[in-house]
Amino acid sequence: MRALFPGRFQPFHKGHLAVVKWSLERVDELVIVVGSAQESHTLQNPMTAGERVLAIRRALEDEGIDLRKVYIIPVPDILMNSAWVAHVRTYVPPFEAVVTRNPLVKVLFEEAGYEVLEPPPFGREKYVATNIRALMALGDPKWEEMVPRAVAEIIKELGIIRRMRELSKRD
Amino acid sequence: MRALFPGRFQPFHKGHLAVVKWSLERVDELVIVVGSAQESHTLQNPMTAGERVLAIRRALEDEGIDLRKVYIIPVPDILMNSAWVAHVRTYVPPFEAVVTRNPLVKVLFEEAGYEVLEPPPFGREKYVATNIRALMALGDPKWEEMVPRAVAEIIKELGIIRRMRELSKRD
Amino acid sequence: MRALFPGRFQPFHKGHLAVVKWSLERVDELVIVVGSAQESHTLQNPMTAGERVLAIRRALEDEGIDLRKVYIIPVPDILMNSAWVAHVRTYVPPFEAVVTRNPLVKVLFEEAGYEVLEPPPFGREKYVATNIRALMALGDPKWEEMVPRAVAEIIKELGIIRRMRELSKRD
Amino acid sequence: MRALFPGRFQPFHKGHLAVVKWSLERVDELVIVVGSAQESHTLQNPMTAGERVLAIRRALEDEGIDLRKVYIIPVPDILMNSAWVAHVRTYVPPFEAVVTRNPLVKVLFEEAGYEVLEPPPFGREKYVATNIRALMALGDPKWEEMVPRAVAEIIKELGIIRRMRELSKRD
Amino acid sequence: MRALFPGRFQPFHKGHLAVVKWSLERVDELVIVVGSAQESHTLQNPMTAGERVLAIRRALEDEGIDLRKVYIIPVPDILMNSAWVAHVRTYVPPFEAVVTRNPLVKVLFEEAGYEVLEPPPFGREKYVATNIRALMALGDPKWEEMVPRAVAEIIKELGIIRRMRELSKRD
Amino acid sequence: MRALFPGRFQPFHKGHLAVVKWSLERVDELVIVVGSAQESHTLQNPMTAGERVLAIRRALEDEGIDLRKVYIIPVPDILMNSAWVAHVRTYVPPFEAVVTRNPLVKVLFEEAGYEVLEPPPFGREKYVATNIRALMALGDPKWEEMVPRAVAEIIKELGIIRRMRELSKRD
């Protein structure tokens, strides 16, 4: 069975990694959908889709996850919820299930007839992307403990922290 | 060095595969950009982006190419040539060069300051996507010899031939 | 005279029905424009355009309104207020007036030279779409009294209440 | 059962009317989808969506067809065939089948799991929209015999012939 | 009176310049609308909107035309003819007339209630943008005589000839 | 050197005028980019792009600024920050620098390799567009002192105050 795991991954944190591992114990192949691919350079969405693809890829390699079992595919938004499943389906190989806890994603895929796999709330209280981004914008290094080691490295290498600190300045 | 290899890959044929191998002798990582990602279900563009991603992936695996050196990323069209390079750049990891023989792609990436690597015209006379699609629509099995074995299999498995034969009927 | 009556109709309530009746006493034909047609599956816009068209149609039939005097036409948003009147005009038969109390709609149609018919604020304090949607999301059946009987039936038949309750869950 | 009947209806001719009648003998309700709604003012697509809605409505009334069994809904194009069914579905009430002879429409709805009803080729050799438009642009009144009487009247009333004759002039 | 003069100006030639002069004898201010602003880097549309703005500006200055009487404003396409006038109107100061010989432009502005000023066919047989572009792509310097001197200079300075020669190569 | 000065100019106020003058002491030509060109008829964005172009033009003329050194070019939004610089570049003549104090604009142009010229915060406490628009919507004439005289005149002439007062009414 092939399943989707959609998210914005701004950034890809340890909770996301736990979901990937949990999923790979249940499905043959996992398609990580990097959503809102067109967004970047804001405090809410600091990284480009390509930067997120790179960070996820490095994290998976660093964790020794078999890349032959994973696809990482950026998908831009479409401003029509009722066509979103069909839109995503265009960008990815055929799949049978979706891994998500998000209410909107669940409703849309259920109405489209897909199976929904709900992962446990891995470290939900600790790994919250909003908090991680707030620390990044403040330049507080505590964000580094919340993401896989390889993600922290690539984020620093790509200059994302400097970008976020600039973006958080006043006009 | 990381390089892009953009194409529509309708379908991914033996000439494309030769370019991938040629590129991987020259660069560290190759990003295969599956262009016109929004197109499908026409005789000119029969496969969805996700179907093309799957076909390319299977071909690379079948050829024993190291997946850690390759990214396969679908990118939709943007109706503005002068912003196309920046648009593509959003979807992919940072890169320094582009592998192409296409005049428009060359002009756009050169004007944007990228290095262009021009591969030899591998089997240009034999592997022409337009001809391959014509054979597919006719149901003539000669198309199978023009694509990597794994691509032929996945195309049949996905029902692309049946789709093309239906699409070529008269109203 | 033919007039437009634009709204989002999320959902079509008794105040809307009163406006339709008021209008049909003043004009020969009424075009009900179901706006923001691309929106659905959110707490703010739960129903698809087609579901809203169906609900309105059933309400009009149930009330014995002559369907030959009414058009129900979904229109998606255009992100340009100054071209919105021309955009709407494309989707509907020629018209001379617009029925509205909305300040933006009034300004845009007045600047375009159309007559504006301002209906009385029918049950404004009782029939507020925001409140109706809040009750629907809570599963509180009081919303049913605020919409025409046929609308309540079709909303339940289409599973809109279940959809809204799912959407209002936490991640 | 509710079924869709999609077309561009540039203009709605006697062959289209025959399909509507044929369909209403087989389904409870018919949704006439006026496609390419955004197109108008060209020789290929002379009428706006609203003008086409009006022409179809008048033809149905003139033929004594019960309007309670028919929906006429304009739908703009989406540049993604694989999401087109979901896009159309947003604009219309729930349906189970589609009435069409068009190969692309058939493939897309079949892949989406809908039943396809194929009507006979009513007067295919006589009622060809391309020919009708050519006569209209030439100002040759023979086009009038090819469309329902009410359509001919509304086309003349709306000034479509004059528009087409202007558009066919040389720069 | 203020009037529009819409065109693609690929490139701005001596016929266009004659229309500008003819117009400025009849109206107080002229708004030159550089249409299809999103197009560039093709043989049909080689120059970006900004390059065309620059070329027109230089030509007007070189001819001693008072810049206080002219606006040069790029406008992207909108894929909806019936909303095009409203779309253009958004980008430009209020105006009363349009200068054009193009049938579609005439029909659209006349239906919107604007006055149409039809200029004489200045050197129609000599100054044809299609022919000028063909000469440019061939590298034949005869194109230079067909455009104002300042336009020829800026085209060479911007590297447009080299771009067109590259674009006209075979894959 | 040619530089860009991007803004929304809702409306163009005395602080903006000071930046234009400051820039023209440092660069040869200034391109005033009227951003969010597609927005209008809201309290946040009351004026169309064309109305803003007209207001800026009148202000520059009234101040005796040489129009041969200035371009005023409307540019619509693109929903992709990482492609925004390339998008803007399409609409304007070639340039080397950008005049801005906006953090996002700085980050985007710096990442694209452009020089950023940061003007002093001219009358920052006095000339705040948000406050000016609030006064305009209230009908408080104090806004007139905050914009160049010619801008105040054209705003009144175009009926912008009346439009804003209408838009600020309750439904």
Swiss-Prot record, chains A, B, C, D, E, F:
Residues annotated as transmembrane: none
Highest taxon, organism lineage: Archaea
InterPro entries according to UniProt: Cyt_trans-like, NMN_Atrans_arc, Rossmann-like_a/b/a_fold
UniProt pathway: Cofactor biosynthesis; NAD(+) biosynthesis; NAD(+) from nicotinamide D-ribonucleotide: step 1/1
Keyword Nucleotidyltransferase: yes
GO biological process, one term: NAD biosynthetic process
A single GO cellular-component term on record: cytoplasm
One of the Pfam families matching this protein, by short name: CTP_transf_like
HAMAP family on file: NMN_adenylyltr
NCBIfam families for this protein: arch_NMN_Atrans, cyt_tran_rel, PRK01153.1
Family listed: Belongs to the archaeal NMN adenylyltransferase family.
Protein name as it appears in the record: Nicotinamide-nucleotide adenylyltransferase
Organism: Ignicoccus hospitalis (strain KIN4/I / DSM 18386 / JCM 14125)
